A protein has these predicted regions:
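Bacterial N-terminal signal peptides
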Residues: 17-27
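Contiguous beta-strand/loop segments that form the cofactor/metal-binding neighborhood of enzyme cores
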Residues: 225-300, 327-338, 358-359
């Protein structure tokens, strides 16, 4: 029997090398898991609560918040116990000082272009809350700046992180229902005022200039984005839309309901966007040549095949980096994923803006708009 000499110098060196390798591995993993350094632009979007909660949990490193309204500084400082040093009124001064990895927009949709005007020449990527812009003209300006200065401009949609939607997409790509023939998206809720949105959020959300429209922009963008994704970036050939004003006393300036028909060469999309649903809804139906898929919510899917075989399933949880906007953003900036042909990409969201612009023109004129 050979006895191992624990005091042999070679064994000591091996232990040292193993220990060093372990330390390097741990250090590398720790570095890889460091939260992304961001600047937040704007505090008048109610989605801000999500990112500030993540900051307090250490999920994201917010190095500064730029908001011209100091009243909102105090509001969110008190709610989330934030230091005064985090707040600024000037975005350009803040990003020059802190040099963040990205800027996250939580301001009025019409002001997204202002963020890009500041960040693009400085080479700083931007992610905004949906939709990309209030108007197609603003979106084209964003696209031009992003191209000129070679930055990423991404758009965050809640539904991008729905496991059920990703599962439906994957099943379609695997030819489980044949070619897409019809897509139906229902999105909305009882109304922003009815569900308790803050006055600062309501101020711009119900303004035709600051939001670009009412429910048409607010919730029509979801269906337009999903259909662009399902059609793999194909542009539609025509758009027809009807908007309604069911609650003029509450929303005097903008539509509160929109129905949008999107025509593709061999498929049709129907978007039903409203502030008049009896409950909050985000679901997606896809009819194929020989089957039907319905993402009922974030997780649950029902199906029906031509032979009348019915089924249901719970989608598997999404895995990184397509399971969370911050993880996704980090992966794009690290060139681990392209961010050029998905729901968040600028390429797809320019098509979204073309659809929304055509829908507004169609609703105003009563005509089918050919793209």
């Amino acid at each position: 029997m050979i006895k191992r000499n624990l005091k042999h110098p070679l064994f000591g060196k091996q232990k040292l090398m193993l220990l060093l390798s372990f330390i390097i591995c741990i250090a590398g993993n720790t570095s890889a898991q460091q939260p992304i350094r961001v600047v937040v632009a704007g505090l008048n979007h109610d989605h801000i609560h999500g990112i500030l909660s993540q900051y307090n949990k250490g999920v994201v490193d917010i190095v500064g918040i730029a908001e011209p309204d100091t009243r909102l500084h105090k509001k969110y400082r008190d709610i989330y116990h934030l230091p005064d040093s985090l707040f600024f009124t000037d975005l350009k001064k803040l990003v020059l000082l802190k040099k963040p990895a990205a800027v996250l927009g939580y301001n009025a949709v019409a002001n997204h272009v202002d963020i890009v005007e500041i960040c693009a020449p400085l080479g700083i990527p931007v992610m905004v809350e949906k939709p990309l812009a209030a108007t197609l003209a603003q979106a084209k300006r964003i696209e031009k700046l992003a191209g000129k200065y070679h930055i990423k401009v991404l758009t965050n949609y809640e539904t991008t992180w729905y496991a059920s939607y990703r599962d439906v997409y994957n099943m379609i790509r695997s030819d489980s229902i044949g070619l897409i023939k019809k897509m139906v998206a229902h999105d909305g809720h009882q109304g922003p005022k009815e569900i308790g949105c803050s006055p600062d959020f309501l101020h711009w959300l119900t303004d035709p200039i600051l939001n670009g429209a009412g429910a048409l922009n607010d919730f029509g963008c979801y269906g337009a984005d999903l259909m662009t994704w399902l059609m793999q970036g194909k542009k539609p050939i025509a758009v027809t839309a009807v908007t309604r004003h069911y609650k003029p006393a509450i929303y005097p300036k903008v539509d509160d309901d929109a129905t949008i028909i999107i025509e593709y060469e061999n498929a049709t999309g129907l978007i039903e966007a409203s502030w008049n649903w009896p409950f909050g809804i985000k679901d997606l139906e896809v009819f194929g040549e020989h089957g039907y898929l319905h993402a009922l919510d974030k997780e649950n899917i029902s199906s029906r095949m031509r032979e009348n075989r019915k089924g249901s399933k719970v989608a598997e949880p999404l895995i990184a980096p397509i399971n969370d906007p911050l993880i996704y953003l980090t992966a794009v900036l690290q060139n681990k994923i392209p961010g050029t042909d998905d729901q968040s990409s600028l390429q797809y969201n320019m098509i979204v803006m073309e659809i929304l612009d055509a829908a507004k023109r169609s609703a105003a004129s009563g005509k089918r708009i050919v793209l």
